[in-house]
Amino acid sequence: LSFCLAACCNEIIESPESKSEDDFTSKMGLHILGSNDTRSSISPDEDQIKNICVMAYDEKDGRLACAQTARSADEIEMELRAGTYNIYVTANMGEFDAPIKEQDIGDAFHSIEDIAQLGQALPMCWKDRTVLKAGEKTTLYAKLSRLVSKVDFSVETGVLEGLEITSVRLCQAAGVIRPFMEGGS
């Protein structure tokens, strides 16, 4: 007994092996938008970025697909498989310890050991969801949010005779920041 099967097709169907890696990957860059919502009257450079960390989590399985730390957003370029990603960005926190599973991102933290650690570059963050298409470069436009505020206090005692300041106290200064915790840190 013999059996024969034949088919006709007008189009050539490419097998996945015949496609190049570029047909499945996408490049992602980052651009930081200026923050005009809050500006300092004392130090105009508080929005500067000394370092930035970008983490991309695959929406399908919630796992870390890529993480990069750089001195500026211009240095960030990720190559990822086409798909949907949740992107998390931290600034001025050094190399952020990105968890492997996205569900653990709320527990990730940054410690502030000393107020001098903040300098003029305040910790900031941003998150968003993006779809990356195969063979295309996508630029994300991030508007970072400050995670701390800085208060400078100065008094000219010569203006008011008899004024004597005995103490100044700052309450509720964060020692730990959890930038992506639901409801704040």
Language-model segments: residues:
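Sec-dependent N-terminal signal peptides
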Residues: 1-3
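Short, low-hydrophobicity acidic/polar segments
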Residues: 10, 16-21, 26-162
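C-terminal motif of bacterial Sec signal peptides marking the signal peptidase cleavage site
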Residues: 5-7
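Short helix-loop boundary/capping segments
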Residues: 157-185
